[in-house]
From Swiss-Prot:
UniProt signal peptide: none
Top-rank taxon: Bacteria
InterPro entries: CoA-transferase_III_domain (IPR050483), CoA-Trfase_fam_III (IPR003673), CoA-Trfase_III_dom3_sf (IPR044855), CoA-Trfase_III_dom_1_sf (IPR023606), Formyl_CoA_transfer (IPR017659)
Residues binding substrate, per UniProt: 247-249
Example of a GO MF term: formyl-CoA transferase activity
GO biological process, one term: oxalate catabolic process
Listed name of the protein: Formyl-CoA:oxalate CoA-transferase
Keyword Transferase: yes
Gene that specifies this protein: frc
Family: Belongs to the CoA-transferase III family. Frc subfamily.
Keywords: Transferase
Entry keyword annotation includes Transcription: no
Pathway: Metabolic intermediate degradation; oxalate degradation; CO(2) and formate from oxalate: step 1/2
HAMAP family: Formyl_CoA_transfer
Organism of this sequence: Rhodopseudomonas palustris (strain HaA2)
């Protein structure tokens, strides 16, 4: 069966997490992703957070499935020739270098267009044009500058970053969509274009409901926030709201049976208006159905702390799974707080390919996330990440069409090996 992106070739100059997230998704959809790495060291994450000495780390392997690796010294004249040939042979170049790095390598947008007018150049940067465009950005910096951290946490505590990688992986997913869109447009125009995704922009896009609330503040308090029911005035910016739901339906994380010893014995509970009477029945507060303080959604907003305290009295008598079973029968929205251990052992996630077991030649078997997007006519088979330079000769021969003599010349030039250190005179 053919894959959705069969025939698309990606020149992957990305490293760490944001860019590799993008190119891995494209590889899962069938693109031929050629990862260009520095000879001798490769992507820095190969050696970061290693759990097994002298093998590629999980940090690297889980972001680089289904790719081929070529090592190339792009400062070497022969290396530049190979890179030029790769640009000529590929459809998309993806990079997440610091600002200006590609230009300093001698491959400006104009130069790339001269080599291959159909080339799409896709870039991840920390910021878009503006006062911070030259600043270095990592995951947590993106969360802090994109509005996520200022609105995450509790009102009386400091800003918090989320455990989800919305800055790195989130921006990588945004860029992948931009690349596919540019490929579609190229089908009609025949021309390549530049695609850029800034991490600050990506985080702000994912935090859009907070920008919504910022504008609502001009017209009065945010009544679904706990702060309103507590009688605490709002300031001029969206506050941190703990675990309050951001969708207009009051929600909280509540303790379940065993919370004293299990840090994840909790459930998220949404007091949705259409099932309010069922909630009252479940927790044994049938009088709330008609009580003026609880009968309508507007009336309940001033009493959310009391309401959820009472619901929590009930959830604490059940395990999170028992509570979920009972609540789901009445269509009451809820979800258990699942640990990474529970997710790793979830048979249904294995069955759908959301979590997969991968066999690697040096580190053995490990678990990874699979493709979260399922296409009925383009199923994803997760293949292990490449060893450093594993496909160098294969790419030189099969992609670029170099003969044995040319390949030997490239090897002899030092373009595929770590640069030699000059001895001090």
């Amino acid at each position: 069966m053919t894959k959705a992106l069969d025939g698309v070739r990606i020149l992957d100059f990305t490293h760490v997490q944001s860019g590799p997230t993008c190119t891995q998704l494209l590889a899962w959809f069938g693109a031929d992703v050629i990862k260009v790495e520095r000879p001798g060291t490769g992507d820095i994450t190969r050696g970061q957070l290693q759990d097994i000495p002298k093998v590629d780390s999980l940090y690297f392997t889980m972001l680089n499935h289904n790719k081929r690796s070529i090592t190339l010294d792009t400062k070497n004249p022969k290396g530049k020739e190979v890179l030029t040939a790769l640009i000529r042979s590929c459809d998309v170049l993806v990079e997440n270098f610091g600002p200006g790095v590609l230009d300093r390598m001698g491959f400006t947008w104009d130069k790339i267009q001269e080599i291959n007018p159909r080339m799409i150049v896709a870039s991840i940067k920390g910021f878009g044009p503006g006062p911070y465009e030259d600043c270095k950005v990592y995951e947590n910096v993106a969360q802090c500058t994109g509005g996520a951290a200022s609105t995450t946490g509790f009102r009386d505590g400091p800003p918090l970053v989320t455990g989800a990688q919305i800055g790195d992986s989130g921006t990588g997913l945004h860029l992948a969509l931009g690349i596919v869109t540019a490929l579609y447009q190229r089908h009609h125009t025949g021309r390549g274009q530049r695609v850029t995704a800034a991490m600050q922009d990506g985080v702000l896009n994912l935090s859009r409901v907070k920008l919504r609330d910022q504008q609502r503040l001009a017209h009065g308090p945010l009544k679904e926030y706990s702060q309103f029911g507590e009688g605490i005035p709002f300031g001029d910016a969206v506050p941190r709201a703990g675990n309050d739901s951001g969708g207009g339906q009051p929600g909280r994380i509540l303790k379940c049976k065993g919370w004293e010893t299990d840090p994840n014995a909790y459930i998220y509970f949404i007091a949705q208006a259409p099932v309010w009477e069922k909630i009252c029945d479940v927790i044994g507060e049938t009088g709330w159905k008609t009580h003026p303080d609880y009968a309508t959604p507007p009336a309940r907003l001033k009493h959310l702390n009391d309401i959820f305290a009472r619901i929590e009295q009930w959830t604490m008598t059940k395990t999170k799974f028992e509570a979920m079973d009972i609540l789901n029968r009445d269509d009451i929205p809820c979800g258990p707080i699942l640990s990474m251990k529970e997710l790793a052992e979830d048979a249904s996630l294995r069955a759908t390919g959301t979590i997969v077991e991968v066999d690697h030649p040096t580190r053995g078997k490990y678990l990874s996330v699979g493709n979260p997007i399922k296409l009925s006519d383009s199923p994803t088979h997760v293949e292990r990440s490449p060893l450093l330079g594993e496909h160098t000769d294969e790419i030189l021969r099969d992609v670029l069409g170099f003969n044995d003599h040319q390949v030997a010349e490239i090897h002899d030039s030092g373009a595929l090996a770590p640069p030699r250190k000059q001895a001090a005179e």
